[in-house]
Amino acid sequence: MSSQEKLLKTVIRPHVSDKTYGLSDANSTIVFEVARFANKQDVKNAVEKLFEVKVESVNILNVKGKARRFGRVEGGTKAWKKAYVKLAEGHDINFVGAE
């Protein structure tokens, strides 16, 4: 896997919820769903290069999958990795596209 490919596969999508919206307003922390292979340094490099911002710190946690039933079939949701990315002062990522 080339370095450009790894950057694009590291950050999967932003994780948007009421809690993450509050974090982004209060202390410029953006939450991303990231690849399971990614570590803090991978996430930092990917966010800095893809969004052209300065990253101050990265915290990562693993979210366990939950048991779910689909009718009579037992299954579950997949486990995934979440990254809290704190941006340096004066930097911002705008996902909406409005200026």
Swiss-Prot record:
GO cellular component entries: ribonucleoprotein complex; ribosome
Top-level taxon: Bacteria
GO biological process, one term: translation
Chain segments annotated as transmembrane: none
Keyword Protein biosynthesis part of the UniProt annotation: no
Molecular function via GO: rRNA binding; structural constituent of ribosome
Keywords, ordered alphabetically: Ribonucleoprotein, Ribosomal protein, RNA-binding, rRNA-binding
Pfam (any one): Ribosomal_L23
Family the entry assigns: Belongs to the universal ribosomal protein uL23 family.
Biological role stated in the UniProt entry: One of the early assembly proteins it binds 23S rRNA. One of the proteins that surrounds the polypeptide exit tunnel on the outside of the ribosome. Forms the main docking site for trigger factor binding to the ribosome.
Subunit text: Part of the 50S ribosomal subunit. Contacts protein L29, and trigger factor when it is bound to the ribosome.
The protein's name: Large ribosomal subunit protein uL23
Source species: Francisella tularensis subsp. tularensis (strain SCHU S4 / Schu 4)
Upper lineage: Bacteria, Pseudomonadati, Pseudomonadota, Gammaproteobacteria, Thiotrichales
Gene name linked to the record: rplW
